[in-house]
Structures are given as structure tokens and as C-alpha cells.
């Protein structure tokens, strides 16, 4: 089974392609709304598409602003100004997505993907 994912403008095209190559349905922000759209518009579009949001935007990791229980799922990639960890982070994410490929596994959860772990908040 594949996941429905919505990548925002911060996510490199290579990541989008890697997710597609893994068999996931990936929607790209710039194909649906302007790249400069407010965060609220971005997450609303993910909801409208019934997709898990994938973002490098740290604002989506704020559970006070974006309570996980209100969304189909948020995957926040935690680079923290360390681009050298990006390959490790992507490997961790793709391995996790392969092992957990059903949408209900993501609903109402925030996934903080770091190079050496994934933290999950409900």
C-alpha cells in the first residue's frame, strides 16, 4: 500500500522523486498552490488532498500551532542547519515509510525525523 504525501516548497525535488520511486503518491505544493502560501494554507491543502504533509519548515513541528490530532499527519524533517545529515535523515525516513505504509499509521501524529531517530507525537 502506498501513502499519500504532500511535499511543501522546502522539500528538494530529489526527495519528492525518491518518495515517488518508493511507490508513494506524492503531491507537490507548487503544483497546487503558490510556493509563498502561508503555512495555514499549506497544511489545509494537505488536508484537502487527504495527504500527510512532508516539510523542512520547522513551524510545522510546533504542536501548539499545529496540534497533530487535527491533521492527516505531519512529517517534519529536522535538518537544523546541518545539511550533511540529510542523507542519513532521508534513509531513516524512507526505511520508516517502507515499514509503515498505511495512512492510519500517520493520522493525528507528528513525526520529527532526525538523522538518528524519529520522534512521534500524538
Tell where the protein language model's regions lie, with residue ranges.
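N-terminal first-folded block
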Residues: 3-52
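Active-site donor-binding loop signature of nucleotide-sugar glycosyltransferases
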Residues: 31, 79, 115
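Mid-chain, well-packed structural core segment of small domains
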Residues: 61-93
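Short secondary-structure boundary segments
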Residues: 9, 56-59, 79
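Acidic, metal-binding active-site segment of PIN/NYN-like and related structure-specific nucleases
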Residues: 47-65
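Charged phosphate-binding loop/patch that engages nucleotide di/tri-phosphates or the phosphate backbone
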Residues: 95-122
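Glycine-rich nucleotide phosphate-binding loop and flanking beta-alpha elements
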Residues: 13, 60-62, 119
Amino acid at each position: 500500500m502506498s501513502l499519500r504525501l504532500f511535499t511543501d516548497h522546502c522539500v528538494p525535488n530529489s526527495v519528492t522523486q525518491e518518495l515517488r520511486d518508493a511507490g508513494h503518491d506524492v503531491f507537490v505544493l507548487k503544483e497546487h498552490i503558490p510556493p509563498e502560501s502561508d503555512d495555514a494554507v499549506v497544511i489545509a491543502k494537505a488536508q484537502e488532498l487527504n495527504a500527510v504533509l512532508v516539510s523542512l519548515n520547522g513551524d510545522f513541528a510546533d504542536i501548539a500551532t499545529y496540534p497533530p490530532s487535527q491533521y492527516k499527519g505531519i512529517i517534519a524533517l529536522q535538518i537544523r542547519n546541518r545539511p550533511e545529515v540529510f542523507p542519513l535523515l532521508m534513509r531513516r525516513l524512507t526505511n520508516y515509510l517502507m515499514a509503515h505504509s498505511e495512512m492510519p499509521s500517520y493520522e493525528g501524529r507528528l513525526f520529527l525525523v532526525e538523522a538518528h531517530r524519529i520522534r512521534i507525537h500524538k
